[in-house]
């Protein structure tokens, strides 16, 4: 039978029928129906290596565990807010752990100390919840037993949900329990063909409850005896085959309709199980305020790997300075130098050999990079302190961004130039390469990378983003860049700035980019 977890500091008596699956009478508690409602949170203990295992190849054991913990923190906040509106709804936390019973019974040997520590963490997150270990041979039987437990406790409606759906809300919970009070069952479809939430009335018959949670057993029986369908009548065998191959949501929906009770279908939502889910939510963060402010939104960005891509050509001493500057960040980010030729590297960084041309170099290195975020940096730049955190913070609010710049040395003319460049991001929605452009790798490749042109690839890339309506951001911190393009006297610098302005204007009017590139090389 299922056992309650009350005080973690005291040993509880062992269950007399340990691991036994609960069984319901023919009609579930019809005579003792009450108006009490239960919210069942189904989860694992947040232990590294034992939770979110499909994320481990991507994020590692600790990273996967931290994703799970962030989801639990969001759920705890959601429940606190919801409970202020629906004080009569009781929270049950059904947890899964390899040593669940030992934790329940207070066994404090070395093998389960970690489980106990994580249980205490959950206790702090959910102080009002009743903790119960999951029981059953598969996930379906575990869910069935959780419902039986709450029904036997006198609850007329119970809603079971996982913590791995970022967009659950107070309003959605209120809608669910309103449906529960009106006698409806509830089912919420997840994007992968399963379901993220299921609500049941206690008056569901025992045979109907068995059917709702029987898919796991059907599939297991078929694995053990794949020839069993041949022994059935053709029409029965075909129906059995369809049920075995049905996705979990459709199978469960059919079983719920068969109860004869009205069914509320909730909005389809995406849970977080694998790398594709993390990528999808990371792309959504800049467009969703709730996700920006959530624990899971911040955790997804915190774990995003950054690849720093530096295009180089005839850099000389500038290259060694950049290598030295990046040395403290070797373990925090992937660093790739896109070598266009005639450079001398120290050998401590990854070098990608590319045909000469800044666009070609950056695109080639981007294909090799493994990061979730691509940061394109000019070799003559000096990075601000905390630039990696600044990048993640900027991408929390916009899908693509850059740093503000200032020139070294900072003369009055160059201060004006940097002001115009920084303001241009807001005013004209244009970023230049010397500002350090960064964005998610998916967006970069969706945009086709930098246009393969000999000049103004950064300018055209910005125009492409602008045309697609993609918002841009500007970091508060400033990146220092050299004024090597603007050598000479005050008037010579001014003439170069003016000529560059005219080159962009002529490019917008459709003049040949190769001819313009020759004029630009004359300037350099």
Where are these regions (language model features)?
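Short aromatic/hydrophobic "clamp" motif used to bind/position activated sugar donors
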Residues: 158, 374
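Catalytic donor-sugar/metal-binding loop of nucleotide-sugar-dependent glycosyltransferases
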Residues: 256-264, 453, 463-480
């Amino acid at each position: 039978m299922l056992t309650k977890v009350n005080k973690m500091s005291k040993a509880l008596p062992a269950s007399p029928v340990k691991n036994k699956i609960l069984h319901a009478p023919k009609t579930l508690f019809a005579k003792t129906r009450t108006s009490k409602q239960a919210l069942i949170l189904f989860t694992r203990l947040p232990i590294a290596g034992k939770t979110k295992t499909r994320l481990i190849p991507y994020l590692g054991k600790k990273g996967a565990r931290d994703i799970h913990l962030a989801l639990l923190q969001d759920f705890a906040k959601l429940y606190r807010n919801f409970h202020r509106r629906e004080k009569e709804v009781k929270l049950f936390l059904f947890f899964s752990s390899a040593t669940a019973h030992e934790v329940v019974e207070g066994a404090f040997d070395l093998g389960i100390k970690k489980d106990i520590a994580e249980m205490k963490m959950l206790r702090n997150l959910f102080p009002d919840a009743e903790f119960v270990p999951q029981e059953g041979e598969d996930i379906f039987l575990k869910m069935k037993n959780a419902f039986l437990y709450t029904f036997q406790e006198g609850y007329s409606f119970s809603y079971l949900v996982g913590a791995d759906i970022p967009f659950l809300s107070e309003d959605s919970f209120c809608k669910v329990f309103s449906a529960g009070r009106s006698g409806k069952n509830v089912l919420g479809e997840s994007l992968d063909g399963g379901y993220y939430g299921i609500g049941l009335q206690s008056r569901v018959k025992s045979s109907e409850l068995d059917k709702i949670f029987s898919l796991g057993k059907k599939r297991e029986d078929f694995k053990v005896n794949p020839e069993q369908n041949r022994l059935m009548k053709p029409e029965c065998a075909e129906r059995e085959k369809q049920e075995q191959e049905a996705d979990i949501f459709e199978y469960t929906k059919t079983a719920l309709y068969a109860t004869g009770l009205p069914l509320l279908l909730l909005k389809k939502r995406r849970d977080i199980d694998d790398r594709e889910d993390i990528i999808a939510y990371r792309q959504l963060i800049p467009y969703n305020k709730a996700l920006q402010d959530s624990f899971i939104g911040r955790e997804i960005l915190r774990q995003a790997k950054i690849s720093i891509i530096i295009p180089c050509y005839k850099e000389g001493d500038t290259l060694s300075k950049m290598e030295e500057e990046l040395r403290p960040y070797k373990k925090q980010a992937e660093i790739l130098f896109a070598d266009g030729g005639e450079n001398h590297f120290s050998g401590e960084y990854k070098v990608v050999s590319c045909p000469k041309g800044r666009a070609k170099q950056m695109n080639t290195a981007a294909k090799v990079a493994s990061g979730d975020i691509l940061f394109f940096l000019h070799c003559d730049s000096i990075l601000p302190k905390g630039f990696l955190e600044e990048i993640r913070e900027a991408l929390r609010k916009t899908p693509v961004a850059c740093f503000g710049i200032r020139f070294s040395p900072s003369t009055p003319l160059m201060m004006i130039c940097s002001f115009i460049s920084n303001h241009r991001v807001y005013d004209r929605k244009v970023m230049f390469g010397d500002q350090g452009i960064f964005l998610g790798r998916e967006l970069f490749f969706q945009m086709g990378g930098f246009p393969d042109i000999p000049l103004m690839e950064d300018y055209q890339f910005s125009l492409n983003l602008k045309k697609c309506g993609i918002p841009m951001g500007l970091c508060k911190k400033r990146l220092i860049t050299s004024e090597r393009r603007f050598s000479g006297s005050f008037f010579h610098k001014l003439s170069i700035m003016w000529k560059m302005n005219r080159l962009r204007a002529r490019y917008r009017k459709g003049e040949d980019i190769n001819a313009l590139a020759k004029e630009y090389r004359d300037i350099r």
